[in-house]
Regions:
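Conserved alpha/beta enzyme-core scaffold
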Residues: 1-194
Length: 194
């Protein structure tokens, strides 16, 4: 809302285009990882995904699980050589997911559009993030959201997203059954990712 700003410049030509990211192709390996990850995400849980092909693959797999659970389960079964491991999830999302992520990316938009990103935190937000980065379509989605829906996406300081301090009890409750999905450049012998 305009009341949150000191100055607003409204004139043609004063609206530079936001930097948008290209969509990278999603490999077969990314899709396979995405299916496995989606089976580990609990209904009513919390999700963090990053930008790039792996985040896109996880998003696609979660949508498949929600909208075509039989196809999802069969795909997972085949990836697991005939038997789905115990404890894996294959059912649609009833309660839905909440997201806590430094970066608000296209994948969260898709999960919201498909009725998956819908579990509200204590403050009513379905997502807390520190910044956003995405495609032109993602930016259009954000611009065109009605105010009431826009309020579901709460942009906060990075420290709010990354730390429990300050509102620890509420953040722990909000971030139940969290799954954090990222890629790394390398892993050390002790398991640290860089």
């Amino acid at each position: 809302p305009a009341r949150r700003f000191f100055h607003i410049l409204e004139t043609q030509g004063a609206e530079p285009r936001l930097f948008s990211t290209p969509k990278q192709p999603v490999s077969d390996a990314d899709h396979a990882i995405g299916i496995h990850v989606a089976s580990l995400v609990r209904d009513g849980g919390t999700l963090q995904i990053g930008i790039g092909s792996l985040g896109d693959a996880v998003t696609a797999a979660l949508v498949m699980r929600h909208e075509a659970p039989d196809v999802f389960a069969e795909t997972l079964r085949r990836l697991c050589h005939g038997e789905i491991p115990q404890g894996r999830e294959t059912q649609p999302f009833e309660t839905g997911l909440y997201a806590a992520s430094e970066m608000f990316v296209d994948g969260f938009m898709e999960l919201y559009r498909h009725g998956i990103l819908k579990r509200k935190a204590g403050d009513g937000a379905v997502l807390h993030a520190g910044f956003f980065l995405g495609t032109e379509a993602f930016y259009s989605f954000l611009r065109e959201l009605p105010d009431k829906e826009r309020d579901l996406f709460s942009m906060r300081g990075i420290s709010f997203v990354n730390e429990l301090f300050g509102e620890e009890a509420q953040k722990r409750a909000d971030r139940a059954d969290a799954r954090f999905v990222n890629t790394a450049m390398m892993a050390t012998l002790l398991g640290e990712t860089i």
